[in-house]
Amino acid sequence: MKKIGVLAFQGGVIEHVKKIEELGHIPVLVKKNEDLEGIDGLILPGGESTTIGKFLIETGLKDKILSLAEQGMPMWGTCAGAILLSKSIKNQGSGVLPLLDIVIERNAYGSQIDSFRKEVFVPRFNKTTECVFIRAPKIVDVGSNVEVLAQLDTPIAVLQGTILATTFHPELTSQNYWHSFFVENMIK
């Protein structure tokens, strides 16, 4: 069994926890540095990226997470988590954890009322997955070392080494493809 940390300040925390449990692994709620001890991977859920980033800095988690990333710990950001992991946020600088060579634009699909679900084919899975977009960011550029796993008009899921980002919320669907990919394929 693998221990998967879920950053637990806000957002789809409980939904990610349930997906991890469905796969037979152990979720660990991460709110302080000590919670990172012994985990095998870390999920940064959606929510409000500015607020989550502020908590990461205030709690000292930012530096510890960056250190773990340098050591090769797999990490996955969904929606706001993808913003946190971005090296560049369009017209705003960089994410708090700038580990992923992408340029991202906040709320690019519109406001809460513009939220939508879409079926998207993912070649890596050879399956169509349901994607839920809620005030979702848009990846507007990717670096040469970034693999695009899924896209609509622009990339919606990317992978760079041990860092995964999705601009949508896989935790809000009945499917478990993305969580399985993260836990079973990315975490050794």
UniProtKB/Swiss-Prot annotation:
Active site (record annotation): C79 (nucleophile), H169 (charge relay system), E171 (charge relay system)
Binding site for L-glutamine: G47, E48, S49, R106, I134, R135
Catalytic activity, reaction form: aldehydo-D-ribose 5-phosphate + D-glyceraldehyde 3-phosphate + L-glutamine = pyridoxal 5'-phosphate + L-glutamate + phosphate + 3 H2O + H(+); L-glutamine + H2O = L-glutamate + NH4(+)
Enzyme Commission code: 4.3.3.6, 3.5.1.2
Subunit and partners: In the presence of PdxS, forms a dodecamer of heterodimers. Only shows activity in the heterodimer.
PANTHER family: PYRIDOXAL 5'-PHOSPHATE SYNTHASE SUBUNIT SNO, PYRIDOXAL 5'-PHOSPHATE SYNTHASE SUBUNIT SNO1-RELATED
HAMAP family given in the database record: PdxT (MF_01615)
Summary of the function given for this chain in its UniProt record: Catalyzes the hydrolysis of glutamine to glutamate and ammonia as part of the biosynthesis of pyridoxal 5'-phosphate. The resulting ammonia molecule is channeled to the active site of PdxS.
Family note: Belongs to the glutaminase PdxT/SNO family.
Family matches, as NCBIfam families: PLP_synth_Pdx2
Protein name: Pyridoxal 5'-phosphate synthase subunit PdxT
Protein source organism: Caldicellulosiruptor saccharolyticus (strain ATCC 43494 / DSM 8903 / Tp8T 6331)
Gene: pdxT
